[in-house]
Amino acid sequence: MYNNALHGIYLTQITWMKSARAEPYLYYIVTEVEKRNLPIELALMPLIESDFNASAYSHKHASGLWQLTPAIAKYFKVQISPWYDGRQDVIDSTRAALNFMEYLHKRFDGDWYHAIAALNLGEGRVLRAISNIKNKANPLIFQLKTAQTNQSVRAKRTSCGTIIKKPKNAFPAILNSPTIAVLPVDCAVILDNRKQWQQLEIFKPMV
């Protein structure tokens, strides 16, 4: 069931989440989505999954902007070690997430609704629901079982649709230009103090 109140709350929260959080990543993500000719709405999936928090970590051990689980990360060759978690790297995680979305899109016969549902609920769960419907089982069973856990996701997704259709009413403007670059390093570097390493002159993008 669509919850208009939740939609309004999330639309307000999305504005509050501000461009400041999305700005370091959004240009890169949009560019990668466009390169693959995927729906531009997918660029806002990190808003739904993690509120554009690259360090987000869930109780199910999903992490990063796209909330990739260890199993999905491993399958799509994202490195996870005590020193480095590629799920928290916008480049590695975006590559894996878009590969995963393309796989799900193909797996569900080109149905983006099912593909995105599988991203949130799990591939097997959505496949079982589709099978139940095809076998004339009660399709409401799936809806009832997932309504509570998926309600907030649907509300956020609807709010994202509003943002795309009426951008002037939502996000403040973000510069349409690159904000990140790949930097060469010769050894392991601890980057916990972002203000400190951003000021280091030796960290300059490769031209």
UniProtKB/Swiss-Prot annotation:
* Gene3D superfamilies xref list: 1.10.530.10
| GO cellular component terms, A-Z | membrane
What CDD domains would the database entry show? MltD-like
The UniProt entry annotates the active site at: E49
The record's section on InterPro entries has: Lysozyme-like_dom_sf, Transglyc_AS, Transglycosylase_SLT_dom_1
- Quote the PROSITE patterns the UniProt record gives: TRANSGLYCOSYLASE
Map out region (Slt-type domain) in residue numbers.
37-122
Cross-referenced Pfam families:
SLT
Molecular function GO labels: peptidoglycan lytic transglycosylase activity
GO-annotated biological processes: peptidoglycan metabolic process
Q: Which family does it belong to?
A: Belongs to the transglycosylase Slt family.
Name recorded for this polypeptide: Putative tributyltin chloride resistance protein
Q: Which organism is it from?
A: Alteromonas sp. (strain M-1)
